[in-house]
Amino acid sequence: MNQFIHPDFKLNGKSFSYIELLSEALYLKENGQLFEKNIGKFLLEWLNNESFVLVQTSGSTGKPKKIVLQKSAMIASAKATGTFFNLQPKASALLCLSADYIAGKMMLVRAITLGLQLDTAEPNSNPLGNKKYDFVAM
């Protein structure tokens, strides 16, 4: 269903075709650190032939549960965020949230959809280091 990858999209400095991104996702899922495994798992779900992804709610308003999100709605949200923040292709972005949760998943969707150059970092209290980014969700 979702084979579109913006030509300007980069993950940790590397460009990917659809097949290459699938391969990278599988590698991360099998061999990465925990935060990278979560990225790999989500990318595999994002790139599959289903029209939806399953997302675990946080439980902040009740019992945690799995919900279905349509990929088309996630793409529309990514585009709306890009418009609101005037994010242009090749803008730098940082994923420093777990891809186990919607905020981290949406950073990946935004990067793939808008052509952002996304760096990933293990979630911690000081993820930025010395690099400046155009867009970071924290």
Protein language model features and the residues they cover:
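Short, contiguous clusters of charged residues that form electrostatic/catalytic patches at enzyme active sites
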Residues: 37, 41, 75-79, 106
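Flexible, charged surface loops at secondary-structure boundaries
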Residues: 2, 47-48, 86-90, 127-133
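Long, mid-chain structured domain cores
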Residues: 83-87, 119-120
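Conserved pre-ATP/AMP-binding loop-to-beta segment of ANL
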Residues: 38-55, 89-90
